Amino acid sequence: FAGCMTLLTPRILLAMERIFKASGEEVWWADKEGGVCCGRPLKLSGETDSARKMMDYNIALFRKHRITTLVTSCPICLKVFREEYHLEGIEVLHHSEYMLRLIRDGRLQLRRGAQTFTYHDPCELGRGSRIYDQPREVIEAVGVLLEPAQTREHALCCGSSVANTAISDAQQLRLARSVAKELSATGAGTIVTACPLCKTASARGAAGREV
């Protein structure tokens, strides 16, 4: 389940396609049958009836295809699926959890190099779902992880959110630049995050740095 923001960040989608192919995983893409959004943006905007219809549609799709594992790249979708969908019999994983499983099972062959990375904990994934270690283990399987000054539960917010209407675009950009500055201070060659919203915001704040 790519979700709205992953569809707007196609490099994530392409990367997941390569990972699925490399691992030999049999995959069904919910997005190709209209399962594009988890329903949270509609719910937060007060469109509760429309949100419920979307959620019911997604559940019907999942049951129709008899899926046993649901993988998403969006921490918001992850939290909504786990807490609001009541998907009995379906395991819901963030892509970092799924990738780590593939690595541990020997289904994804990687070579560790000298490339340096720094990791930004997304609010929804870290503080929201308590997922901190799995993304780091995936990074350390391919290179060297350099932690920023504020990390894990103390990580800075990137400034973007599907519900963030309380601050202006200029304020969002200022927050994104603060995050990018702290991450860049690690000296890492590549900035990594595990949320499509954070990726977009960090790239904007980093002004040309690879994210």
Regions found by a protein language model. Name each.
Residues F1-V211:
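Iron-sulfur cluster-binding electron-transfer modules in prokaryotic oxidoreductases
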